[in-house]
A protein has these predicted regions:
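CN hydrolase (nitrilase-like) catalytic-core segments centered on the catalytic cysteine
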Residues: 2-87
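Cysteine/selenocysteine-centered motifs that mediate thiol-based redox chemistry or coordinate metal-sulfur cofactors
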Residues: 3, 97-125
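A sequence-level detector of short, solvent-exposed, charge-rich linear segments
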Residues: 16, 20, 53, 57, ...
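A generic membrane alpha-helix/interface feature
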Residues: 23, 60, 89, 109-111, ...
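A short, polar/charged loop-to-alpha-helix boundary motif
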Residues: 84-102
Length: 125
């Protein structure tokens, strides 16, 4: 998305407890995965997540919230709680993000023309 001009990544999610193991809390892993997108692409991430409990006939699922905003290097600059609806505000500098992408080799030296084989199941271009 960044290669196509995106300046922010928005991730609306509905992630929470695992019905098979209600003691398992994946919220830290979920945040690290989203933060990895921010750091590797030098782009701010805004990740929203549901809160509360949803009850079905034979199942109940808990959504752990913890929505957050990162800056362009993956630092969390705002984070929500687990149990209440909130509006998060974070100050993001898009020009700093663009400058870093042009300077730091992780993004600058990408060669997307070589990725074509990854787009097909058989690896052909």
């Amino acid at each position: 998305m960044v290669l196509n001009g995106a300046e922010l990544l928005l991730y609306p999610t509905a992630i929470g407890g695992e019905p098979e193991d209600d003691g398992f809390d994946s919220s830290d892993m979920w945040q690290r995965a989203m933060i990895g997108h921010s750091a590797s692409k030098q782009i701010p991430v805004i990740a929203s997540n549901r809160i509360g409990t949803e009850k079905g006939i034979d199942i109940e699922n808990y959504f752990y919230g913890r929505s957050f905003v990162t800056n362009h290097v993956g630092d969390k600059i705002a984070e929500g709680s687990r149990d209440k609806e909130e509006v998060l505000i974070g100050k993001i500098n898009l020009s700093e993000a663009e400058t870093l992408r042009n300077v730091w080799g992780v993004f600058r030296d990408r060669r997307p023309e070589l990725y074509k084989g990854l787009l097909n199941l058989d690896g052909s271009e």
